[in-house]
Amino acid sequence: MPSVLWILFDGGGDRPTGGKTPFYVAFKPVIDYFTSLGSCGILDPISPGVRPGSDTAHLALFGYDPYRYYTGRGAFEALGAGVDLRPGDVAFRTNLATVDESGVVVDRRAGRYIAPEEARAVERLMASIGEEVGKAYGVEVLYRSTVEHRGVLVLRGPVSHKVSDTDPHKVGERIHMSEPLDGSKEAALTAQVVNEITRRFSAAAEGLEVNKARKASGRPPINAILLRGGGYMPQIEPVKERYKVRAAAIAGVALIRGVARAVGMDVYTAPGLGGTKDDVFDEAVKLAVELMSRYDVVFLHVKGTDSTAHDGDFRGKVSVIERLDKALSPYVDKIAGNYLVVTSDHATPVSIREHTGEPVPFLLYGPDVVTDDVGKFSELTCWRGALGRLRGIDVMPTLSSYLGLAEKFGE
């Protein structure tokens, strides 16, 4: 029985720069070959005009209405970082950041690259802060670094996710104070804990030895921590029960591993797949092809297209696409007897450097899929394809149907 290889370029969608997009410019003979043999369309990850987060977009793409199942980004980050959340736990996504002398955020990612020894130093500092704050407020505080500037903070005890973010979500502003969003004592306590952790981190981080080295080399210091997306673990029907598919996900980013884990996918990583713009895809693609013999759907997440777009790096985004395509080239014959999906979870135009709400290109190839006349995978071409305009939540039912696993609706 055939299976599906699903390649997801995070933030891969774009707007034309000089009349062309990274997908259009990229030399990607394998993807374009299957485009010439498959059906194309454009995809609204959630719905037209909605600017998706990667979390809500992946929920929709995996077949779950984000308006029903989304409970905050933090829970998925924690799951993806290997934290087993308990009922009542509240988790936050964190960014290591840089603020100036007046406390204004000048870099929400502290230069993006955080070396392993720097991440370990931050974890030691956060463990000390967590122990002190935990004793003072009667909660347990867990922190774990994930990829680059990213991390996860988990609060355990009489806490609530009903608090506001400290992350201003843009540079040029001070770190926000967390505020309770309802009148509960749990929300009030949680906001106090979040603000105290934020304050203590900023006070202590300047003294970190790794910051002295960063400053000496001209790199921005890690002197602030930003929290956002407080949430709890939702109750989600596994994808095997809902869509009858055995699914696996390969991802280097904690958030995506967490969403996949939450919907019941088996989660894998591969050498070279660290969730950065410099990822090497050969081992990840090899693993994906091997897993196709054991799973109905194998999902491969490519983060670098989003990271480069957030940095405004057009050529870097093109390079990520081309490197992934090159990694596919040894497996063309293997893929040809199965199904292939290529798409994005949202657009991150290099000219905007943020997620936007336009549709993204979509390809479905398979031995029994109608062939249209598109021939080249890009925003400028896929709109002419046979599939028309789809929603993210349509993808998994469509794949289940092609695999012969979908149940009939009615008689």
From Swiss-Prot:
GO BP term (any one): glycolytic process
Keywords: Glycolysis, Isomerase
EC code(s) of this entry: 5.4.2.12
Matching NCBIfam families: apgM, PRK04024.1
Catalytic reaction equation(s): (2R)-2-phosphoglycerate = (2R)-3-phosphoglycerate
Pathway in which the depicted protein is active: Carbohydrate degradation; glycolysis; pyruvate from D-glyceraldehyde 3-phosphate: step 3/5
Family: Belongs to the BPG-independent phosphoglycerate mutase family. A-PGAM subfamily.
GO molecular function: metal ion binding; phosphoglycerate mutase activity
Protein's UniProt name: 2,3-bisphosphoglycerate-independent phosphoglycerate mutase
Role, per record: Catalyzes the interconversion of 2-phosphoglycerate and 3-phosphoglycerate.
Stored Pfam families: Metalloenzyme, PhosphMutase
Enzyme class label: isomerase
Classification via CDD domains: iPGM_like
